[in-house]
């Protein structure tokens, strides 16, 4: 019998899209996507375009010292307590409190030297806490057996070996051409002869006046006066005859007594022109006079023949 309000028609209306086979029902992962447009346009979490924000690392610039096992094993650790009691003298019976105060005072001094930040009570509490750790117990066992010195000697040897290996590794660096060129230039500058400026600076203490070195321009030689009192000497030390002008008159000699020794030449000098003797100069002048007379006679003959 149909319902008065037509419930059967309503049920048919809502049940038309339901498949009869349960396998055709959508799975849990095939549901409709919410905000589909946003997901299509957005970036998926697992995609390559996503930027990974790394957490900032907090760097401690001035770390505060801490009371650790390494501090107790260090150069101011527990093994140095006996150094604070080397010269202690107990007063004996009747002064027990004074002796105990002296012991505590020296212990406080050691604790303050090892870790100044803590009070003496805090130092004792931390030592009691750290004393349960195995590295500190091993350290105390070696201290009682007198093996700390041997261990430190082995550590020093290992440190020296590491430094030697580091130096050897630094010596095996690749060859640098620039360094080799620089070293070659330095060696050449040491082997090169000193310049006139360096020579003058090196001989300034001897109170001698230096002459300018001689230079050559082609066949002309410009020489400088050398040291001497009444004579002139060449580079080999031999005496040189006085020079004459074109007319055969001797040139005025200069007072060169105040000149020092000549500078060593930076280049091998060209051979100087050979000096002429007095006889050769006189012969040249005579030949020149005869040639002029012959020229005048020839000119007179030519002028007479034309007239």
Swiss-Prot record:
Sorted UniProt keywords: Cell cycle, Cell division, Cytoplasm, DNA damage, Mitosis, Nucleus
Main location (coarse class): cytoplasm
Residue intervals passing through the bilayer: none
Keyword Nucleus set for record: yes
GO molecular function, one term: DNA binding
Compartments where located: Cytoplasm; Nucleus
Pro residues: bias regions: 262-271
Family: Belongs to the CSM3 family.
Name of the featured protein: Protein TIPIN homolog
